[in-house]
């Protein structure tokens, strides 16, 4: 099926099959479609609403075309990632949580990019922290195998995305591609916490990952609108485990934490996010630093559970709390900076 036929179907509010979606996505991602066609396709898909079959097809093509990171083992390797677009401009919770995971001995293959609508994307934060981003897949694998954490800069691993960049930018709206990033980890992780910008996406994306072979995933959206677990409101979870999907709400109190306002956790820049994270991961904390630490503990705990590194969400949160207060997570961030600096010298020689 070519994109013109697909557009005719979509205008008629008809879904594409998984295979038809694969064909159209392959045309888009290999430069066979005009920008007008891509923009029309993305807008039509949004107005129709993307089906699970269509998302599965799109994800499978992006994974196929990605520059992959080959790890010695995927057992227990986790990613904690969000779609973004929640409008809250909270500091980089998932990226900070990744260093707590690594300090706990849980390997992390972190996938991320620069900010699109927010103030600080994961790549922006890590760059502000002095971490070199332009790594080869082999170098990323060495980071994960040696330190227990590595960062995969999305634009380096999904170069085929450049064909859709113009239409996406000019549309200025959330499209299918906003959902695809968290589902296309170049290391092929089977354990994830995926934050989404709308509760209605939780179950569908859990079903997509179920069909694509994921093992243990939490797809989450908080009642106060965050694409992660919130301290200020209940969080809705669609959990994929043992091939089954269950849905439930989680209150901070269910996990031994206290509900509190998120006031003071919004940031205006990557540097501000880094300063708050340094405060949160350090031994002495300001009031906002303590609150940020609890937000990190909540989300890192969920990822420890998704990685099967903890037996329950509550046990994961307890472990994350203990690890964060050792100061080892901040040390892990500094280790990654030093480790990648060597690769920078190699790559720029």
Swiss-Prot record:
Anthranilate 1 binds at residues 82, 113. GO terms for molecular function: anthranilate phosphoribosyltransferase activity; magnesium ion binding. One of its GO terms (cellular component) is cytosol. Pathway: Amino-acid biosynthesis; L-tryptophan biosynthesis; L-tryptophan from chorismate: step 2/5. Its cofactor is Mg(2+). Mg(2+) 2 binds at residues 227-228. Homodimer. NCBIfam families: trpD. Belongs to the anthranilate phosphoribosyltransferase family. This is Anthranilate phosphoribosyltransferase. It comes from Pseudomonas putida (strain ATCC 700007 / DSM 6899 / JCM 31910 / BCRC 17059 / LMG 24140 / F1). The gene is trpD.
């Amino acid at each position: 099926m070519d994109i013109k036929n697909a557009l005719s179907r979509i205008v008629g509010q008809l879904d594409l099959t998984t295979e038809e979606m694969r064909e159209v996505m392959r045309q888009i991602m290999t430069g066979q479609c005009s920008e007008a066609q891509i923009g029309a396709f993305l807008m039509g898909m949004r107005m129709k609403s993307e089906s699970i079959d269509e998302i599965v097809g799109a994800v499978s093509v992006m994974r196929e075309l990605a520059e992959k990171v080959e790890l010695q083992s995927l057992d227990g390797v986790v990613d904690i990632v969000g779609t973004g677009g929640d409008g809250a401009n909270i500091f980089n919770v998932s990226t900070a949580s990744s260093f707590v995971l690594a300090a706990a001995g849980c390997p992390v293959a972190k996938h991320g990019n620069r900010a699109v609508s927010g103030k600080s994307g994961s790549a922006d934060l890590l760059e502000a922290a002095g971490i070199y981003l332009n790594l080869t897949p082999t170098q990323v694998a060495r980071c994960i195998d040696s330190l227990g954490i590595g960062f995969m800069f999305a634009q380096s691993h999904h170069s085929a995305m450049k064909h859709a960049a113009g239409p996406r930018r000019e549309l200025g709206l959330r499209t299918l591609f906003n959902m695809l990033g968290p589902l296309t980890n170049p290391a092929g992780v089977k354990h994830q916490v995926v934050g989404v910008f709308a509760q209605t996406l939780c179950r569908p994306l859990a079903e997509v990952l179920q069909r694509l072979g994921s093992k243990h995933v939490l797809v989450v959206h908080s009642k106060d609108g965050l694409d992660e677990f919130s301290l200020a409101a209940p969080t809705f979870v669609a959990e994929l485990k043992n091939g089954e999907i269950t849905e439930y709400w989680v209150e901070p109190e269910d996990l031994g934490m206290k509900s509190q306002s998120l006031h003071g956790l919004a940031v205006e820049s990557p540097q501000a996010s880094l300063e708050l994270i340094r405060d949160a991961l350090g031994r002495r904390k300001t009031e906002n630093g303590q609150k940020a630490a609890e937000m990190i503990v909540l989300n890192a705990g969920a990822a420890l559970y998704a990685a099967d590194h903890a037996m329950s969400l509550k046990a994961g949160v307890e472990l994350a709390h203990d690890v964060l207060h050792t100061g080892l997570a901040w040390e892990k961030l500094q280790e990654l900076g030093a480790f990648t600096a060597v690769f920078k010298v190699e790559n720029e020689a």
